[in-house]
């Protein structure tokens, strides 16, 4: 079993950082320029986050649109947590099969530099929520 309690727990942490990225005055416009949609299918616990960067929308679970995203990604929620804490190299994780990706992966990789400034914000978000357990679990 993973560190997250349930799907709403994933949405309140990982989903929240996507919302903050889109709302950020510097990062948000750059994500909209990329005009990608990414559907993240997490395990441990089962949860779905669909991010439509072009429209600036984040959807959780059954609220995810039926439209096919440009990219589908699959991973454990704990691995997404590690990524947002700067402790998981996404390219290496994909090479090892720890993270699966289908679709416009090269376009998604171009967006990776936008994530780095959010690592500290994600850690602060977890601390504000009293989720030191997620920080410690990332190693």
Regions from the language model: what does each represent?
Residues 1-139:
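Feature captures hydrophobic
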């Amino acid at each position: 079993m993973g560190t997250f309690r349930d799907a709403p727990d994933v949405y309140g942490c990982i989903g929240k950082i996507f919302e903050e990225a889109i709302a950020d005055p510097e990062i948000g416009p750059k994500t909209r320029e990329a005009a990608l949609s990414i559907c993240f299918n997490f395990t441990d616990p089962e949860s779905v986050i669909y991010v439509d960067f072009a429209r600036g929308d984040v959807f959780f679970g059954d609220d995810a649109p039926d439209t096919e995203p440009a990219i589908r990604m699959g991973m454990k929620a704990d691995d997404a947590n590690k990524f947002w804490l700067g402790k998981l190299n996404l390219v290496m994780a994909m090479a090892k099969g720890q993270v699966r990706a289908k679709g416009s992966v090269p376009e998604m990789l171009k967006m990776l530099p936008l994530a780095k400034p959010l690592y500290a914000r994600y850690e602060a978000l977890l601390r504000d929520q009293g989720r030191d357990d997620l920080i410690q679990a990332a190693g």
